[in-house]
């Protein structure tokens, strides 16, 4: 969370338009996110800058569970098809909607 915050602060200080996302949903564990040493950091993150998905993996797993991966037993990273679909269906519309492009 500290790295996310520092990155957001730097980009905003430099007036750089940006968006963020995660490969997997790293924010779902409420026990961790509500821990006193984490909660105050979590509450400072500007989640409006994040893509409206849980993570790249979860989005592909839900929308392209077969075509979006080469072999889930060996690699959880989306393949080229999965990345292209995520870019076309999520990233580009998000960039347009938020006047980033």
Across the structure, where does each feature detected by a protein language model lie?
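Alpha-helical cap/lid subdomain in secreted, periplasmic
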Residues: 1-101
